Amino acid sequence: MQLADLTQRLAALGAKPQHIGRITRAWLQGKPLDTGTKHQKTENFLPLSVRQELPAIAAELDALVRLRSEHPGADGSARLLVELADKQMVESVLLPRDGLCISSQVGCAVGCVFCMTGKSGLLRQLSSAEMVAQVALGRRFRPVKKVVFMGMGEPAHNLDNVLEAIDLLGTEGGIGHKNLVFSTVGDPRVFERLPQQRVRPALALSLHTTDAELRQRLLPKAPRIDPEQLMELGEAYARSIDYPIQYQWTLLKGINDSQQEMDNILRLFKGKFAVLNLIPYNSLDADNYQRPDGERIVQMVRYLHSRGVLTKVRNSAGQDIDGGCGQLRARAVDLVNTSRLRLSRH
């Protein structure tokens, strides 16, 4: 289901824009679709034809996503394993301070070497309704005032659906435009489309290195955009929305934590409307990467910050509960496959 399908269905039942808006807002808040207001009951507002169909519509919306399991973290986050109607699984993460990280694809085609999600490749796109449904689900647990498209998938590879979801969340969803964050490895279509939108979200760009050849190895299927060019594109968007770009940098010991990288960061970030997020690597099973030790990370932050680069350390939420993107899903899929194998042997 796409969000447009819901609107068209309600309109066909005789719902006016104000009716559709109220029903949509109730869904986005994780409330029953027939929720009224303090001053007006549903039966005095919605047409009878719409009210009669609401139970069936609610059942379809509830079927979009289902909580498979919840995994609270020591940092106040909670990782949600979410099952879709076709039994595929994605991850959402409730973040401290009323944030929610959602997925835009099942799997991912970019194939970042340090990311579990990319190891499965792209399995399918999420519809705009499936993305918004993750927000509705999250709001059943706690308030959600910020939504970041940083879960499984590359939003630029599902651009129409992601932009449709962002538009609804930034209007009927009641989320401030700067509290909607579009995260991408960098794609020319993103820089063309985002400035044209009614809701223009904040932007996070996966940089990870200042070395173009190294970036190609780390992000093998990302568009071939030189880091310097990527930052120029980001800068233009930052100035247009008057909000800084977040540049993501997954810290890999001995790979992108050198003094040369830091000096290049100083050069590229000079005068930029930007924030650098250093993300210590979250180890996967049987991989070849490690995070730098804590002392080295502190040195990097102090060096960059003291020279004018606003630098923050962002640990993956819920590191104690398979915190790296895609790890929870990978373990669940492995358990399902193992169970099927055992059954086939009996």
Curated annotation (Swiss-Prot):
* PROSITE patterns linked: RADICAL_SAM
This enzyme's EC code(s):
2.1.1.-
Q: Which GO terms describe its molecular function?
A: 4 iron, 4 sulfur cluster binding; metal ion binding; RNA methyltransferase activity
Q: Which cofactor does it need?
A: [4Fe-4S] cluster
In this chain, S-adenosyl-L-methionine is annotated as bound at 153-154, 183, 206-208, 282
Q: According to the lineage, what is the superkingdom?
A: Bacteria
Main localization, broad class: cytoplasm
List, in alphabetical order, the GO biological process terms annotated in this UniProt record.
Answer: rRNA base methylation; tRNA methylation
**Species, as recorded:** Ectopseudomonas mendocina (strain ymp)
Q: What is the lineage of its organism?
A: Bacteria, Pseudomonadati, Pseudomonadota, Gammaproteobacteria, Pseudomonadales
What the entry lists under InterPro entries is as follows: Aldolase_TIM (IPR013785), Methyltransferase_A (IPR040072), rRNA_lsu_MTrfase_RlmN/Cfr (IPR004383), rSAM (IPR007197)
Cysteine pairs forming cystine bridges in this chain are 101-325
Q: What protein is this chain from?
A: Probable RNA methyltransferase Pmen_2155
- The annotated active site, in chain numbering, is 91, 325
Q: Which Gene3D superfamilies match?
A: Aldolase class I
Q: Which SUPFAM superfamilies match?
A: Radical SAM enzymes
